[in-house]
Every structure is written in C-alpha cells, then in structure tokens.
C-alpha cells in the first residue's frame, strides 16, 4: 500500500521516543495537550545506554508522580560510588575515587540540594516508564512509524511519516513539532538548525553481557570500573570501561577502536575477547547479549528551533557519556519547553513565549557538550602517570604500571602523580554544579535589577541555592501539620506558584485577581508560624533572599521568574505585570 491515508491532526507531534521524546510526550499528556509520538523503532530502547540519573531529572519524575516507580527500578546511590581504576577487574587496583556525592564531604551537598537522590536507571528501563504513563494519560504513541519530511506554514506543521507495518505513508498535521530523534536527527537536518563542533571524534564499542561478578565487585560497589591496559588509549574514551547495568550480573563494557579504520567486525568471538580482556580472567562464564559501535561527538546547536519546530536532546547536544549528562539534559529540555507549549496552546500565553526555550536551553546545550568533552581530557593524565605514553611496547607498558609497587624515588613520584591525576577526575564524577546550577536569562525571566553576587564556590563542582529570578526555586524542608514537605512539592505540576513568608498574606488576594484576569493557575503558599506551612527548621528564611512580606514567583518548571523583596502599595499590579511579561501576554 502506497496511498496516503487521511491526514491525522494533533496539537503536538513528537518525533522520537528516547529520553527527550518520551519525557515530552509524557509532560504534554499530563498537561492535557493532544500529543502524538512517533518512533521508527519497534519499541523503546533495548540497550541500557544512558544510565546516570541526577537529582534534577528525579525532580522532574517527582513532579510527574513517578519518582517512587523510578527508584524501584533503579540502583541506588549507595551502589554507585566506589569508582575503581584497575588493570583488569580481577587484576591490580590502581586507585579509587568516591563519586556521585557518596564521599562524606560531598554527601551533605547532595542532600541539601534536592528532595531526590542520584540513582542509576538505565535508559531501557526509564523509557518504558515514561511512555507507558504518557499513553495512560492520553498520548497517542506509534512505533514502527518513521518520520520522512515536514513542511511548515503560518498555522502549523505537516509531517509525512511511513508506517513500516502497513508499508504506507501518511500525513500528520500538528500545530507544533518536537524533534527528539537523536544524534542523527532528520528533523534538525530538514529545518537547518546551525550546528557547531564535529562528529566522529573517536570510535567506541559497546558489549552488553551477563556474568555473575559479585565475587569481584560486591565489596566495592560501583557503576564504573575503569580498566587501564595496553591498547586502552586507542579511540573511544581513551580508557576501558566495565559498567554495571544491574548489580551484579548484567554489564556493559566499552572499548575503543581507531575510527580512521572504520568500525570493526563485531562477531561474538571478538566481543567475548574484549570482555574477558577487561575482566582479566577468560574462565569467567559470560553470555554476550548485544554489540554495537558509536562515536564520540563534540557538537551542539546554536539555535534550537525554527518557527514551529523545536529540537531537543541528542539532536541538539551531542557529546560523550562522561559526566552522565545526556539523558538528564534531554529530559530537562522537555521540562522547559512543554509547560510553555501547553500554555500557548491553551491560550494562556503568547506564542513569543516559545522562543525563550532557545534563550534558556541553547546555553545549556553548549555547556554540557563542552563539559563532557573537557572531561575526556581528565583521563590522559592518569595514563601519563602510569608511563603508558612513554612507549608503544605492551610489555614495557606493563612494567611501567608494575613500577608502582617499587620503593624507589621514581616509583614514589609515580604514585604521587597517579593519585593527583585520579583526584583530578572530580569534574567527571562530582560536578554537582553542572547538574544543578542552571541560571536562565530570557524574556520569561523578570530581573529585579540587583547585582548578581555570583557563586561562592566552584560553580561546576558545587550546587548553590539562590532566590534570584532565573534560578531554580531552592529546595528546603518546611512542614505541613508537622510532616516534612519540600518547597519543590509546593510548585510545578503545570502551574505557577507564589511563595511568601508569614507577613505575605496580601499576596493571596493579589494572586487570585492576577490569575483570574490571565486565566492561569497560580497557587499561593504562605510559610511561617501558625500557617498551614511552617518553617520549623528556619531554612526557608535562610534561602529565600526576600523579606517576610516578599514573594517568589515560580514557573511550572520550578524556576523563579520574578521576585518582590517586600509587599508594598502596587505590588499586586507588579505581580500581574510580571506574569504578563513572563507569558508574553500583551
């Protein structure tokens, strides 16, 4: 069958069902937007691929009511942190570093930053959670359906897709289209988004396998075991990796190849050889599940939209897996855009609001690509300290590594250099600020004219709360009827929120008038003694950066978009004016 079927109409067409596409479909369905998601594949991802799930992403899952379901499928933080460098899994250990906030000195930073926790949730487990709930909440999800082309006009987008089950093409008419179709995005290519950087910097091999490795890792639980041996510096990440998928019997190993020679022939014998080499024991029973190749990329889009087409995820930020930023950034792209789309489609905001997606997320795309690629540069000093760059002879490399055990002055210098190099990987594994410190500047943020004090500590390593417009609303624990409630739980869920102290009761009436006049949902929370919400720990007073009668206006994506230092005559009008500005209502 080749004839085109009747045109299908929807409000938003999402191309791709990976982390960005699945999150967009779920968020839009949750907000009541008519949404259709298409994927050329038969199902969600079959391979684990991305896995590190940071607190910002878990906050999105919490907002959607899915945090507990995600935690039930994930490996918790306590099984993630003993990051090991070794000559093979059964061989000599060269050093360890505590990662993902598990070091006692960093644990408090993570606990103070968010009500959620870091976890390891492989992509093949997270995607079905999001897609299943998207469908339950009303989204139309179609697999075996490949995006072919699109045309835009003043009122919408017409996309042609191919149904591979029926072998026919048909058109979908949408008011907006989201391109979340991965690093080889057809949507990005067709609308011609400008890209910077390069693809195919180096080549990598993934081998997913099953093996009971409890004996070797149960006492040093980690997500990543980095294997340094002759040949590990060729291609890939510059180092071999054994990655936990499910503790402690399912794994993914990464090995590089010379991209100039093209992808290798990955038969089962070759895959088994790679796995056993990294394990260091060819007698360990191994079941090869799948193999694949991929390339390290260093590319991002400088503009994320074209008229009614918005792109996100790997389509617009393409980078290596270092720092675990890929799926996290993709899901947060969706969290930024989807409330804006829902407000525009429901007549609560002007279409100009949608341009702020680009203003706010394009800098993030650039940041994560640059950080992930910069982190690759943190591994060569480890190899250099081991003397692996001093020779091309594999036997000499082994002797250089073995020198660590000697008691000579040269060996002492080598041990010090190795420890310093391993400690230098903090920006790879504990870059809490990269994950959490986004600050937005756009037409959907109303600055208050006060000078920005900047960050007190390293903004890549450490998270910092802020009450300034453009910052995420700070998480602290307040109480309702004696039970702890996060300030984040007072916000989000597709609605605007206003937070104030005990002297902020005038904001209640002002918010009602503003919300009614603009047709939006706006919740008001007064926090203080004798109120339904109390600040018994005093933390809200410490982080809000406003007076007791002031207010923080929080967008549906939990970012502060306006603040008033205090209530005064005319504050109600200022609130309404701020909302109109944020929503691009004229």
Swiss-Prot record:
GO terms for molecular function: 2,4-dichlorophenol 6-monooxygenase activity; FAD binding. This is 2,4-dichlorophenol 6-monooxygenase. One of its GO terms (biological process) is 2,4-dichlorophenoxyacetic acid catabolic process. Pathway: Xenobiotic degradation; (2,4-dichlorophenoxy)acetate degradation. Gene3D superfamilies: 3.40.30.120, D-Amino Acid Oxidase, subunit A, domain 2, FAD/NAD(P)-binding domain. FAD binds at residues 11-40, 304-314. Keywords: Aromatic hydrocarbons catabolism, FAD, Flavoprotein, Monooxygenase, NADP, Oxidoreductase. Transforms 2,4-dichlorophenol (2,4-DCP) into 3,5-dichlorocatechol. It comes from Delftia acidovorans.
């Amino acid at each position: 069958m080749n004839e085109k079927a009747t045109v299908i109409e929807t409000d938003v067409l999402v191309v791709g069902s990976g982390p960005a596409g699945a999150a967009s479909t779920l968020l839009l369905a949750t907000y009541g937007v008519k949404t259709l998601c298409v994927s050329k594949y038969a199902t969600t991802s079959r391979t684990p691929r991305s896995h590190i799930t940071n607190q910002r992403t878990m906050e999105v899952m919490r907002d959607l009511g899915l945090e507990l379901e995600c935690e039930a499928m994930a490996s918790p933080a306590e099984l993630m942190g003993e990051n090991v460098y070794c000559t093979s899994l059964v061989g000599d250990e060269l050093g360890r570093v505590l990662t993902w906030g598990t070091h006692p000195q960093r644990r408090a930073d993570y606990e103070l930053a968010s009500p959620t926790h870091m976890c390891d949730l492989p992509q093949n487990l997270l995607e079905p959670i999001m897609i299943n709930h998207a469908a339950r909440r009303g989204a139309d999800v179609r697999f075996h359906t490949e995006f072919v082309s699109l045309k835009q006009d003043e009122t919408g987008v017409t996309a042609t897709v191919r149904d591979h089950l029926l072998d026919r093409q048909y058109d979908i008419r949408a008011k907006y289209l989201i391109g979340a179709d991965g690093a080889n995005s057809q949507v990005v290519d067709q609308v011609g988004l400008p890209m910077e950087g390069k693809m195919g910097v180096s080549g990598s091999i993934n081998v997913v396998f099953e093996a009971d490795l409890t004996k070797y890792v149960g006492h040093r639980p980690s997500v990543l075991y980095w294997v340094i041996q002759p040949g590990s510096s060729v291609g890939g990440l510059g180092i071999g990796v054994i990655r936990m998928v499910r503790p402690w019997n399912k794994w993914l190993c990464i090995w590089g190849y010379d991209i100039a020679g093209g992808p290798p022939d990955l038969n089962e014998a070759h895959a088994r050889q790679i796995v056993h080499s990294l394990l260091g024991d060819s007698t360990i029973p191994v079941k090869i599940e799948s193999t694949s190749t991929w390339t390290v990329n260093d590319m991002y889009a400088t503009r994320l939209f074209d008229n009614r087409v918005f792109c996100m995820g790997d389509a617009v930020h393409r980078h290596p897996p270092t720092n675990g930023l890929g799926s996290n950034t993709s899901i947060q792209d969706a969290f930024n855009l989807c409330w804006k789309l829902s407000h525009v489609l429901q007549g609560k905001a002007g279409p100009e609001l949608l341009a702020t997606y680009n203003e706010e997320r394009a800098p993030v795309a650039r940041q994560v690509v640059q950080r992930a690629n910069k982190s690759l540069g943190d591994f060569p000093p480890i190899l250099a300290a081991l003397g692996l760059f001093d020779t091309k002879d594999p036997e000499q490399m082994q002797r250089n590594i073995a020198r660590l055990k000697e008691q000579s002055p040269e060996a002492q210098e080598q041990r010090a250099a190795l420890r310093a190099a391993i400690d230098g990987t903090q920006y790879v594994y504990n870059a809490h600020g990269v994950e959490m410190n986004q600050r937005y500047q756009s037409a959907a943020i109303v600055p208050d004219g006060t000078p920005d004090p900047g960050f007190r500590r390293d903004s890549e390593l450490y998270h910092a709360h802020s009450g300034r417009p453009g910052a995420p609303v700070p998480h602290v624990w307040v109480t309702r009827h004696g039970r702890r409630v996060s300030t984040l739980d007072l916000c989000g869920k597709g609605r605007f929120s206003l937070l104030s102290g005990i002297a902020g009761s005038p904001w209640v009436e002002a918010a009602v008038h503003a919300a009614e006049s603009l047709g939006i949902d706006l919740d008001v929370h007064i926090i203080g003694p004798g109120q339904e919400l109390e600040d018994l720990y005093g933390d809200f007073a410490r982080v809000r950066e406003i007076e007791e009668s002031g207010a923080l206006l929080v967008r549906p994506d939990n970012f502060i978009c306006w603040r008033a230092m205090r209530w005064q005559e005319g504050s109600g009008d200022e609130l309404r004016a701020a909302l109109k500005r944020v929503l691009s209502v004229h």
